[in-house]
């Protein structure tokens, strides 16, 4: 794609002057552009157009039209093939072309013209050089071009020879030589849209960085560069003009005063019009800018550069210099110059030695080759020139001169950039290639010498001519108070090469000065930029002396046009016969009635402008007088405003007075001297209306500035079109507007017909109107499309990139930058100068309070400045936000910043319904600068985070104002987060709540660290009032120590104070995130976690050494527990967690429990000793136990309370504690029981019933208290092991109590035995036998009472006492023991008395016979009892003596009546022990084994012998079993036969043999076997058989059979066979060898059995068998009984020594 540049300069028509009112249209591809209409036969348009060309096979169609009333007529046309157009980067003088009247068509396309006319037009057409070529290639071509040019510069320049040659300097947007009077003025048409003398254009400005090796020339700049190389071959849209067709300059054509309107778009030069010369190496010096700037280079997509390079070896340089000098001379004649050369030299001396003042600014390109010095070209407008440096009077040796920027006192410049440093040596400015540098030195020194000669010559002439002129208007004025700019709008070239860092670019020093906010450099980057401040000072005066708010509106009247007149606003014809439209009586502007509201510019200034143009001097003077009056009134009424401005910018009174005059003059000159170049890039649109039937539109855009209208190409079928087209305009009226309209192109028949009769044949899609006076610098903005009338159907928005260069202000910062300078300096003045650094917050209310930044006067200054120069309120807000960010820690500022940012957020985020533009896009188009504001917010965010991370220091809880600031700071963070999310549209920016939470945690971390490291000092200061104590601790012992625990107690106190402060002061303050942020809780959590970590390690260390008392550890444990329970336990992070702190203290608690056990034991001994001394007295009337129990459990309970109060939340550790404590309880109580048990018997023997009862009560009370302790320790929930220990202890204590009760009861045994003996004596006196008849019951009762009398007396006297002094449980136990004792004694003494007093049977029975229920079978071990009976019997000598004994004891046997008396007595005793429910329970008494045994014994007395024998057989099933040491065995064969008819049983016994008999005898051993049948109802049957004896045989064989007949009434189970092996002795009783028993129940099923029966030494019996045996032994008259007793009491006889057994 190529850029076609077409300059429509002028034309010459064949015809009368009044006949022509012509404009030119240019058509190429599908784009059409139109010039303004100019009257006259020699019109001069001087307008430049640019087209993007992508097809070089087409041509450019130029049509000249003459405006008509109804339609326009073509004057002529010319077609230029694109291939024939030259390539150049510089504008040429143009070429005269003849207009033809016809076009030649081929394939529906124009391919030429024919039929020439007499009309001619001057056009300059060229293509820009190729775009975006690599830098190396650009350098190569530049060098080639330079070499070519140098070939023509071989001869020495002769100043005299070339006097008449014109200066072939091309006109361009940077420098229109005609403005300086250096060209002929050929503008004949007074109504021409361009003006010849009032334009002060110098250079174009743009915001992006020009490419390297690119040089602009600025005649108005205070620093000029003359490049040593030709310009590069282009940047994307750098419209660098190059000179071409040099021969065409032979006849000098006057250049148009307006120069070329082909100027840069806003994207490129506003920050970079002054560039480095080519010798400056961009790679070696920071002036070239950072990568970010390079990025901005690339982003300047729609930007363009314009410049003229004055090359040292330009082909016509030498020839044309003379003409330059002449023109310069003409021009300088109008100026007042310094009187003499001394002043000039004085001015020269002010040139600094180094590049400091400029090289540190990226906005000023200062580098020049070594062989240069700067030279300033004089400006155009008389009396309105900037301070400009003077050129040196002579050319020194060029090789030795270092580059020196000319720097007068106050050259206004943009701010300084600290990053750049001045070059250290000359090398950095040398050409890259030696040959280039050498060439540059030679040619440039010649050129420069020529320039200096010419210039100095003219200057000297002027000085001589003028003499000592008015120094106040001197072109080369001195520095000083009065030396300000006379024209505010002219400024030297101080444009930046990167966006000026208004607020945020210098924030790297953030951390260093965080306390005062973001560094002051951050928010006051313009404070030290004196040049910029100087300029802004003047612009501020200008805005305030005649503010926009005071402008005069138009005075419209209905007006009748007598000739065809067009509306000034819409250019439509004022239709009608009369009263066609409105006309302002003041300024004469005419418009439709519907358009009058669109014309809102200041009427007075428009009138002045028009009058001056039309020469109506008298009218102009009237208006000027009105303006003067108004300004005087303004100055008189508002002096404080101008005084404040003077103070802000620190201007002296004298200078201020002079400047006020100059400002008033500039206002009077006003718009008559105002002009600007505007570059508009139509980027794209969104959301347009669909106008076609297809549901779409074919949109294009027309852009109109003043009378000049241009259009884009059409985008077919798209409601979101992208054009990316650039247009350039010149504007000479600050009250003009830019009218951007979007249309839907219709290309049908209807449209074409409509086009002939109507100016607007296409459908209207929307418009936006932009005030020109509000433009400065460049903007990239979305505009909502507006309606024209209520009928318009409009939607969507359009994006424009607008760049403006105002004449005289090409080199100054844009208005937004100027506003920033004003705002920042005002902020600095009000805050730092007037208020000692404290931000003064204005008292404003209402919805727009956030837009009030200062008090009334200061606010009016910024508002009027913003209104005058079109600074939007959102920019003001962002600028003030930036200023405040440097003071964000000042009181009240965070709240203001939060509100400001919230409104900024609302502005960008809350898009309107009529536009689809996203917040991100709106913000990206912000004039403040997206990157700048984002960077500012990022830095602010970081600073806020850092300060919040020390909120305790920065926002002390003692200051309510600072707490409010803290709250506002968090609000500000929230606003920043909202901005990032809604405006920047970041996906997931850090949540404000999380950021604050992190900050709070960070602060708490550092707080903990601080209190930990300074614990002793802080504690002493805050909590120790006694000054004597403060110095006790040595510094080295103030920290944690293993020798004591004081540190931790103090630390806990400090931690609590921190948490409480957070909870009570900071939590209510930081309440913006109730669900996510609770400072008190976070404080507790963080503090606890840090404390826990340190505490754990400390306790582990203490565990190793154990240098402190266990009580100290316990106390610390309690403090830690309290801290945890009070602040931590309810925190979400800890709710379901078992805390760790019990584990730290577990070893110390166990140690304490160990020590506590020893203490408890010592306490126990002491308590018992005291109790013993006091005689074990009851503790109170109602308490039946002594004080020792109370004391012991008081101690234990105290210990347990301590454990309990630990409230240990760890079940496992609680289990450990409980186990250990349970052991302590067990050991202490068992020791108590042991001590009591040892001495208990002694107390019982002293016949003091009370003390034993108290001791038993004590034991019972131990059990009661133990049960309570068990429940207190957890009961069923108690640790299993601890529970088992306590349960086992309870059982042991129970056993102890049982034993004590038994011992106590046993002490009464002698008395009871005596009483029972008396009972037996009384019972023996009861006469009567047989059963007792019913009539004798009363006598039996009487007998029973008599019998009971002795025992009752004893019991009654004691039990009454026991009931009083014994615990209920103890009483019952004593009663039980007494009950047992009485029952057993009665049984032994009365029912079953011993056989004799000498025998051991009584003892045997006592020991073995009681406590068993009827029928219970004893184990074989009870055979010991039987043995004792037999042994007793043996002691009597012969068995016959036993029988005699039985006869003697007959009286002891009870009669049935006596049994009845005993039965009744038992019932009485039972009732007595029951005691109506107070004593033992009836069920216990009934089921008492002792009672049952007694009753059973009594029942046996009344049973028949057969029944007793049957009972014996049925119960004694183990008589022959379990023989451990058999004395032999017998083989028998037994058969059982039952007669089927009678049921009679017969038993056949065959004795087969004996075997292995163990017997020793001195005589002959003659064994025989005796077989007895035992059972009921055998008194009349044979019960015994015996075999024959065998001599000396220890294994005799018998094979003898016997038969027994049994009763039919009893079954076989009631019988048994007893086999006895005996040694037959003659004349003496046979001796028993062994016994065996075979019970027939075993044969009942089988019928027969053959078995070996082991022989035992005796028969085994249980207590039932013994009882039966004792009862039957008393029946001496019963043969069966005596035989039974004899059989069962038989035992192996004593052996005699002697013979060995037979083999």
From Swiss-Prot:
Keywords: Calcium, Cell membrane, Cell projection, Coiled coil, Cytoplasm, Differentiation, Exocytosis, Membrane, Metal-binding, Phosphoprotein, Repeat, Synapse, Zinc, Zinc-finger. Residues 186-203, 360-374, 421-433 have a biased composition (Basic and acidic residues). Residues 1093-1236 form the MHD1 domain. Residues 319-353 have a biased composition (Acidic residues). It holds the Pfam family C2. Zn(2+) 2 binds at residues 584, 587, 603. Its main location: cytoplasm. Disulfide bonds: none annotated. Zn(2+) 1 binds at residues 567, 570, 595. The keyword DNA-binding does not apply. Residues 186-445 are annotated as: Disordered. SUPFAM superfamilies: C2 domain (Calcium/lipid-binding domain, CaLB), Cysteine-rich domain. The C2 domains are not involved in calcium-dependent phospholipid binding. The C-terminal region containing both MHD domains and the third C2 domain is required for synaptic vesicle priming activity. This is Protein unc-13 homolog A. It comes from Homo sapiens. The lineage of its organism: Eukaryota, Metazoa, Chordata, Craniata, Vertebrata. The gene is UNC13A.
């Amino acid at each position: 794609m190529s850029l076609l540049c077409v300059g429509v300069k002028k034309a010459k028509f064949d015809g009368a002057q009044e006949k022509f009112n012509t404009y030119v249209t240019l058509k190429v591809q599908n784009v059409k552009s139109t010039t303004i209409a100019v009257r006259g036969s020699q019109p001069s348009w001087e307008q430049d157009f640019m087209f993007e060309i992508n097809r070089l096979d087409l041509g450019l169609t130029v049509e000249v039209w003459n405006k008509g009333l109804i339609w326009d007529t073509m004057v002529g046309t010319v077609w230029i093939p694109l291939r024939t157009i030259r390539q150049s980067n510089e504008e040429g003088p143009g070429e005269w072309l003849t207009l033809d009247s016809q076009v030649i068509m081929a394939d529906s396309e124009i391919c030429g013209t024919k039929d020439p006319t007499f009309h001619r037009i001057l056009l300059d057409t060229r293509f820009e050089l190729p775009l975006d070529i690599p830098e190396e290639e650009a350098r190569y071509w530049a060098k080639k071009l330079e070499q070519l040019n140098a070939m023509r510069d071989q001869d020495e320049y002769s100043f005299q020879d070339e006097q008449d040659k014109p200066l072939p300097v091309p006109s361009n947007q940077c420098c229109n030589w005609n403005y300086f009077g250096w060209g002929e003025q050929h503008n004949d048409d007074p109504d021409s849209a361009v003006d010849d003398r009032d334009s002060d254009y110098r250079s174009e400005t743009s915001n992006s960085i020009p490419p390297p090796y690119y040089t602009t020339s600025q005649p108005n700049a205070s620093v000029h560069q003359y490049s040593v190389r030709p310009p590069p071959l282009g940047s994307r849209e750098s419209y660098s003009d190059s000179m071409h067709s040099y021969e065409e300059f032979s006849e000098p054509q006057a250049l148009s005063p307006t120069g070329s309107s082909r100027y840069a778009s806003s994207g490129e030069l506003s920050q970079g019009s002054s560039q480095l010369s080519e010798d400056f190496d961009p790679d070696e010096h920071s002036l070239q800018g950072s990568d970010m700037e390079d990025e901005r280079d690339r982003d300047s997509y729609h930007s363009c550069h314009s410049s003229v390079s004055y090359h040292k070896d330009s082909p016509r340089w030498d020839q044309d210099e003379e003409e330059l000098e002449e023109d310069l001379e003409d021009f300088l004649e109008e100026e007042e110059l310094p009187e003499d050369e001394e002043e000039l030299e004085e001015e020269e001396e002010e040139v600094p030695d180094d590049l400091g003042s400029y090289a540190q600014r990226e906005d000023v390109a200062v580098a020049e080759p070594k062989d240069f010095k700067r030279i300033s070209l004089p400006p155009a407008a008389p009396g309105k020139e900037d301070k400009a440096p003077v050129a040196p009077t002579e050319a020194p040796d060029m090789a030795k001169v270092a580059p020196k920027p000319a720097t007068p006192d106050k050259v206004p410049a943009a701010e300084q950039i600290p990053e750049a440093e001045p070059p250290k040596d000359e090398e950095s400015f040398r050409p890259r290639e030696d040959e280039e540098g050498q060439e540059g030195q030679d040619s440039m020194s010649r050129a420069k010498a020529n320039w200096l000669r010419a210039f100095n010559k003219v200057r000297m002439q002027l000085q001589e001519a003028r003499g000592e002129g008015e120094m106040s208007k001197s072109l080369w004025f001195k520095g000083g108070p009065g030396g300000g700019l006379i024209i505010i709008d002219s400024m030297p070239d101080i444009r930046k090469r990167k966006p000026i860092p208004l607020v945020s670019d210098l924030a790297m020093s953030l951390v260093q000065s965080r306390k005062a906010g973001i560094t002051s450099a951050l928010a006051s980057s313009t404070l030290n930029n004196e040049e910029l401040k100087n300029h802004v000072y003047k612009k501020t005066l200008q805005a305030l002396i005649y503010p926009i708010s005071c402008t005069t509106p138009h005075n419209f009247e209905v007006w009748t046009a007598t000739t065809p007149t067009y509306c000034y606003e819409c250019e439509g014809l004022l239709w009608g016969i009369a009263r066609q439209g409105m006309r302002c009586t003041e300024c004469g502007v005419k418009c439709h009635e519907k358009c009058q509201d669109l014309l809102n510019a200041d009427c007075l200034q428009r009138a002045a402008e028009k009058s001056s143009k039309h020469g109506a001097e008298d009218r102009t003077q009237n208006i000027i007088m009105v303006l003067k009056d108004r300004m005087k009134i303004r100055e008189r009424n508002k002096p404080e405003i101008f005084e404040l401005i003077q103070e802000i910018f620190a201007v002296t009174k004298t200078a201020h007075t002079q400047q006020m005059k100059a400002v008033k003059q500039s206002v009077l000159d006003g718009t008559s001297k105002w002009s600007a170049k505007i570059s508009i890039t139509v980027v794209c649109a969104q959301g347009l209306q669909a106008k076609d039937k297809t549901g779409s539109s074919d949109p294009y855009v027309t852009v109109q500035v003043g009378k000049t209208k241009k259009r884009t190409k059409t985008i077919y079928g798209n409601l979101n079109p992208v054009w990316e087209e650039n247009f350039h305009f010149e504007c000479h009226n600050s009250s003009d507007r830019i009218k951007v309209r979007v249309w839907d192109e219709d290309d049908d028949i209807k449209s074409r017909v409509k086009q002939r009769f109507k100016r607007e044949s296409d459908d209207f899609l929307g418009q936006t109107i932009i005030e020109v006076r509000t433009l400065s610098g460049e903007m990239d903005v979305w505009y909502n499309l507006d309606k024209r009338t209520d009928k318009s159907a409009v939607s969507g928005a359009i994006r424009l990139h607008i760049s403006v260069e105002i004449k005289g202000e090409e080199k100054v910062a844009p208005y937004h930058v100027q506003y920033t300078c004003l705002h920042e300096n005002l902020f600095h003045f009000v805050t730092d100068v007037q208020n000692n650094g404290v931000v003064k917050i204005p008292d404003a209310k209402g919805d727009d309070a956030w837009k009030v930044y200062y008090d009334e006067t200061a606010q009016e200054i910024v508002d009027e400045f913003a209104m005058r120069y079109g600074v939007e309120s959102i920019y003001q807000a962002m600028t003030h936000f930036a200023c405040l960010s440097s003071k964000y820690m000042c009181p009240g500022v965070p709240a203001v910043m939060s509100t400001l940012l919230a409104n900024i957020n609302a502005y960008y985020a809350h898009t309107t319904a009529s536009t689809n533009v996203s917040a991100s896009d709106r913000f990206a188009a912000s004039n403040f600068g997206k990157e700048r504001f984002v960077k500012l917010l990022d830095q602010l965010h970081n600073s806020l985070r850092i300060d919040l991370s020390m909120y305790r220091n920065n926002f002390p809880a003692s200051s309510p104002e600072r707490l409010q600031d803290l709250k506002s700071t968090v609000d500000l963070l929230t606003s920043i987060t909202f901005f990032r999310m809604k405006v920047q549209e970041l996906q997931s920016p850090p949540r404000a709540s999380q950021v604050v939470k992190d900050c709070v945690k960070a602060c708490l971390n550092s707080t903990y660290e601080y209190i930990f490291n300074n614990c002793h000092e802080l504690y002493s200061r805050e909590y120790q009032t006694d000054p004597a104590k403060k110095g006790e601790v040595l510094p080295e012992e103030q920290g944690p120590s293993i020798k004591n625990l004081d540190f931790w107690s103090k630390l806990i106190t400090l931690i609590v104070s921190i948490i409480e402060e957070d909870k009570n002061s900071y939590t209510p303050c930081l309440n913006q995130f109730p669900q996510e942020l609770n400072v008190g809780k976070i404080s507790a959590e963080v503090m606890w976690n840090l404390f826990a970590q340190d505490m754990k390690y400390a306790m582990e260390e203490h565990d190793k050494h154990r240098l402190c008392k266990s009580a100290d550890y316990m106390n610390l444990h309690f403090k830690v527990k309290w801290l945890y329970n009070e602040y931590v336990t309810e925190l979400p992070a800890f709710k379901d967690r078992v805390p760790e702190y019990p584990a730290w203290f577990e070893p110390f608690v166990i140690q304490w429990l160990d020590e506590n056990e020893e203490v408890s034991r010592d306490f126990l001994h002491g308590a018992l000793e005291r109790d013993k001394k006091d005689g074990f007295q009851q503790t109170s009337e109602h308490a039946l136990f002594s004080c020792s129990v109370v004391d012991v459990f008081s101690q234990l309970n105290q210990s347990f309370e301590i454990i309990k109060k630990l409230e240990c939340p760890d079940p496992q550790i609680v289990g450990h504690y409980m186990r250990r404590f349970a052991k302590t309880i067990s050991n202490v109580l068992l020791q108590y029981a042991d001590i009591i048990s040892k001495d208990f018997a002694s107390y019982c023997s002293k016949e003091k019933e009370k003390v034993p009862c108290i001791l038993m009560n004590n034991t019972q009370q131990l059990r009661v208290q133990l049960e309570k302790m068990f429940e207190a320790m957890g009961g069923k929930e108690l640790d299993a092991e601890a529970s088992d220990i306590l349960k086992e202890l309870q059982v042991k204590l129970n056993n102890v109590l049982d034993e004590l009760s038994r011992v106590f009861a046993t002490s009464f045994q002698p008395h009871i035995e005596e009483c029972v003996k008396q009972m037996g004596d009384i019972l023996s006196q009861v006469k009567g036998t047989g059963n007792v008849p019913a009539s004798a019951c009363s006598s039996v009762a009487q007998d029973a009472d008599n019998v009971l009398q002795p025992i009752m007396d004893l019991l009654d006297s004691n039990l009454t006492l026991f009931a009083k002094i014994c615990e209920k449980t103890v009483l019952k136990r004593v009663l039980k023991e007494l009950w047992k004792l009485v029952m057993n004694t009665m049984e032994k003494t009365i029912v079953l008395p011993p056989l004799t007093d000498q025998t051991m049977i009584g003892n045997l029975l006592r020991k073995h016979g009681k406590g068993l229920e009827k029928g219970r079978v004893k184990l074989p071990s009870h055979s010991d009892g039987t043995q004792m009976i037999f042994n007793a019997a043996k002691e009597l000598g012969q068995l016959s003596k036993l029988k005699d004994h039985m006869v003697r004891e007959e009286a002891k046997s009870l009669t049935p009546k006596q049994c009845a008396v005993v039965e009744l007595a038992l019932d009485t005793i039972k009732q007595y022990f029951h005691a109506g429910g107070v004593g033992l329970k009836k069920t216990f008494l009934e089921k008492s084994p002792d009672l049952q045994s007694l009753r059973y014994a009594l029942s046996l007395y009344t049973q028949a012998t057969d029944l007793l024998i049957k009972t014996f057989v049925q119960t004694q099933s183990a008589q022959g079993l379990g023989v451990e040491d058999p004395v032999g065995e017998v083989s028998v064969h037994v058969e059982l036969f039952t007669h089927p008819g009678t049921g009679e049983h017969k038993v056949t016994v065959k004795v087969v043999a004996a075997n292995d008999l163990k017997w020793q005898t001195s005589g002959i051993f003659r064994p025989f076997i005796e077989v007895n049948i035992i059972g009921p109802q055998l008194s009349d049957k044979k019960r015994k058989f015996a075999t024959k004896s065998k001599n000396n045989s220890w294994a005799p064989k018998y094979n003898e059979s016997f038969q027994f007949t049994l009763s039919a009434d009893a079954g076989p189970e009631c019988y048994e066979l007893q086999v006895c092996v005996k040694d037959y002795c003659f004349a003496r009783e046979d001796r028993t060898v062994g016994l065996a028993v075979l019970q027939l129940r075993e044969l009942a099923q089988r019928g027969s059995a053959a078995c070996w029966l082991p022989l035992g030494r005796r028969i085994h019996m249980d207590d039932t068998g013994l009882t039966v045996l004792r009862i039957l032994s008393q029946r001496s008259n019963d043969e069966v009984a005596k035989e039974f007793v004899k059989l069962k009491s038989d035992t192996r006889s004593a052996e005699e020594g002697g013979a060995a057994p037979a083999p």
